[in-house]
């Protein structure tokens, strides 16, 4: 398991549907090591702290494995790491095998899995598609948030190691299904 890309971005104003909105969903890959702090990565911020960021959403990761699905699903788009607003594009970590509460060593930082991503309208803005949130939720490819247990640094190609598994064994995918799955059987 490893980090494929480290991506950061700062808030900026974007015109969308005739409105000017602040967003930091536009992340760009960076070279070299980046410090992971308690609430974010150096060079990265969230635009709306009422719904983004905070201790339980300090770092957002998205599996590189999902990009091939999206290339097939949306063939007219060109994809680059960070496209989903993730700080870490990872390899070998998936929603169905990561549990809420699992602790991982990512580079020199210790992170804990906290929750799946629950996208806001800015994902639709990022992709220029009104149906993007619906597609994202239906795909089951949510990615996952981490809290920072021990700050450190991370770079593309940093190793990822599972330090401990939460004994409750509730996966990120389980939580995403509870939030976004069909409500008749939940």
Annotate each predicted stretch with a short phrase.
Residues 1-122, 131, 167-186:
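Electropositive, beta-rich accessory/interaction domains or terminal extensions
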Residues 127-134, 138-148:
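Active-site glycine-rich loop that binds ribose-phosphate moieties when present
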Residues 138, 150-153, 168:
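Short amphipathic alpha-helix initiation/capping segments at coil-to-helix junctions
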Residues 160-164:
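Short hydrophobic beta/alpha edge segments that flank linear recognition/processing sites
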